[in-house]
Regions:
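Catalytic-core signal marking the mid-to-C-terminal active-site face
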Residues: 3-4, 9-12, 19, 244-335
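Active-site cofactor/substrate anionic-group-binding motifs, chiefly glycine-
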Residues: 46-101
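A generic, well-ordered mixed alpha/beta core segment in the N-terminal half of proteins
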Residues: 78-167
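Glycine-rich phosphate/pyrophosphate-binding loops
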Residues: 133-144, 238-254
């Protein structure tokens, strides 16, 4: 394992993305989102993914110079065409716009279509939390999960995230599959076995082999209930925003598909929490947080560091394999 300072990791990721053609501001935002995942301990969505993004940038699957193109612009609803750009900076921008408009209109939603993978979805509810708002986020990806009772992958891991301005903030961040696919990839790189019940082979047989799982399918979280929530996420992203469904999204882990745009869609909603109360009180969020603590529990995501306030001196850990891949890319891109 290798240990890096957060500030150094962000600089490295920013430099690599810039060398691959991404403008400085978008590269810096993307790098911070990537490293925030590692800082949260979600290495499967952090620097481990950067070599895959770089490969796709070089092959043409990701447009380094992408710009958000406005499709719909209403007071409480904005939709952008992402122009095949990196999902991180695009979803961060979407969350900031949703937050700004919700503070004026009470609620706002922003969709981004024709985008790419955005990393850990929970990062993008923090622009809302930091403004005292409620945030909800959805995203799609390649089909890896069959419909309930089916034998073909039609749904992505269909992640959903939510942020509530409690003290400390509540951050819900989960895939509706039994496990995020990035964790399967991390297990495959490490040569480790999967937990039983996570995945199936391409023929539908249960497997604990990570490589078989990558070529196969993932189980839904909580059985039919997880499947139902996955359908909801797919509805709010691929079906309604588009331009494509999960079954047609290229696999970022397949080098043979690097040149194919993923055309992923994201959707965020911001709600002004101060406007929701029927009695004018805003104390119940903190009251609940205190009750959870008194009961011996903790709120979901209570230990998550605010991604907009990362400490450059903090440390993250990456595998030796990821460290070697980043060094290889640095040499390849002349850094």
């Amino acid at each position: 394992m290798a240990t890096l300072k957060v500030g150094s990791a962000i600089e490295t990721a920013t430099s690599l993305l810039e060398a691959a053609g991404v403008p400085k501001q978008e590269a810096a935002t993307t790098a911070r989102c990537i490293v925030a995942s590692d800082r949260w301990g979600i290495g499967s969505h952090g620097l481990m993914r950067l070599p895959f993004y770089l490969s796709r940038l070089q092959a043409g699957g990701i447009n380094p110079k992408a710009q958000l193109k406005t499709v719909t612009d209403l007071p409480s609803l904005v939709v952008f065409d992402g122009d095949d750009g990196l999902g991180h900076w695009q979803l961060q921008k979407a969350s900031e716009i949703a937050s700004e408009r919700a503070m004026v209109n009470g609620v706002a939603a922003v969709g981004v279509g024709r985008s790419n993978h955005c990393g850990a979805l929970g990062i993008y509810v923090w622009p809302m939390i930091n403004r005292g708002l409620v945030g909800i986020a959805f995203s799609t990806g390649p089909a890896v999960m069959p419909p309930w009772g089916g034998n073909q992958s039609l749904l992505s891991t269909s992640p959903i995230a939510a942020g509530i301005p409690t003290n400390p903030p509540t951050v819900v961040d989960l895939a509706t599959s039994a496990v995020a696919r990035g964790k399967i990839q991390a297990k495959a790189q490490a040569g480790a076995e999967l937990e039983p019940g996570w995945a199936f082979t391409k023929d539908g047989a249960p497997t604990t082999d990570a490589k078989e799982a990558l070529a196969g399918m993932l189980a839904p979280l909580g059985g039919v209930k997880g499947y139902a929530i996955a359908v909801l996420v797919e509805s709010l992203t691929g079906m309604l925003i588009g331009p494509t469904l999960a079954k047609n999204i290229p696999d970022m882990f397949a080098a043979s598909q690097d040149a194919l745009p993923q055309q992923i869609s994201h959707f965020v909603i911001a709600i002004d929490a101060s406007k929701l109360s029927v009695d004018g009180s805003n104390n119940r969020t903190n009251e609940f947080a205190q009750e959870v603590k008194a009961a011996g529990g903790r709120l979901p995501g209570a230990n998550r560091v605010n991604p907009e306030k990362l400490n450059d001196g903090d440390e993250i850990t990456i595998t030796d394999q990821v460290s070697e891949q980043l060094s290889s890319w640095s040499a390849k891109l002349g850094i």
